[in-house]
């Protein structure tokens, strides 16, 4: 920045013009589907074939969180503990392809949660490291 901008930064700070804060690949559409209990592919097909959305909004909306883990870290909670504690919330759990490891970790957990507080707690639990 050449001049200070409130809420953005001070003179000399670098500011990302575009910051990609989503998982790579098809996970974004999965997360949208889970968070809104919908099917974005069907909505897209409706737009192409009928020029409008035909799939009704079921009105069920929540948060969908992605939490990744790396094999080289020691975590406070085991894979089994995560699955047990969040059994009713986890919608996807898988080992990622090696090409995604540097950006997204080796193991991913995706969960559908009621609100931001529960979402933050899920991410903290999954990613908490041993001290």
Residue ranges and their predicted role:
Residues 12-16, 33, 88, 92:
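Generic secretory/membrane-interface signal
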Residues 45-131:
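Peripheral (often C-terminal) accessory segments that flank ATP-dependent C-N-forming ligase machineries
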Residues 8, 35-38, 60, 95:
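Generic detection of intrinsically disordered/low-complexity segments and helix-coil linkers/edges
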Residues 1-27, 66-79:
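Conserved metal-phosphate-binding beta-hairpin within the catalytic cores
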């Amino acid at each position: 920045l050449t001049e200070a901008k409130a809420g953005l930064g001070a003179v000399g700070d670098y500011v990302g013009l575009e910051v990609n804060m989503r998982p790579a690949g098809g996970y974004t559409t999965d997360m949208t589907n889970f968070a809104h209990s919908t099917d974005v592919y069907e909505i897209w097909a409706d737009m192409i074939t009928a020029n409008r959305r035909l799939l009704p909004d079921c009105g069920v909306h929540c948060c969908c969180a992605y939490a990744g883990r790396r094999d080289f870290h020691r975590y406070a909670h085991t894979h089994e503990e995560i699955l047990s504690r969040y059994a009713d919330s986890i919608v996807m759990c898988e080992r990622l392809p090696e090409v995604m490891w540097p950006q997204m970790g080796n193991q991913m957990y995706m969960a559908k949660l009621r609100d931001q507080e529960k979402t933050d707690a899920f991410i903290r639990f999954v990613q908490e490291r041993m001290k």
